[in-house]
Amino acid sequence: MKIYLVQHGEHLGKEMDPQQSLSKKGTTDIERLGHFLNEKKIEIARILHSSKHRAEQTAAILASSLSSSKKIEFHQGLEPLDPVSPIVDEINQQQHDIMLVGHMPFMGKLIGKLVLLNEDRSIVAFVPGTIACLERTDEGKWLINWIRRP
């Protein structure tokens, strides 16, 4: 099983847009990421995103890029400051590949918890538009398969 951890694309500042929608660069970066995922023929069972508009936009762009159009789903527990343990428990029960679209510092803590079993140890330098693919071994351990940044 694989999970794809995505930090939303670059967004506008609150002073320009109270919803902090994706910027033009952020939209372009995520469209390129979607094209990359489509070329790799990645199959994802579910795409989950936080409540923030920029995460939903990122998820929608990626969903439209994948060959088998997936519906995106809001999922509680993916906000920037949410605890990671509940989502780790949920991920470990999954049998199908999923994508989570969220924010820092949550994504950094999540990958630390999954790979190093310590959410306080950072191992990936996420920037807006980063994706990290993790794969679960037969022993139930998570390993970084690949990472792509804009």
Please report, for each region that a protein language model flagged, where it lies by residue.
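Generic beta-sheet signal
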Residues: 3, 96-102
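Domain-level recognition of soluble alpha/beta enzyme cores
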Residues: 118-143
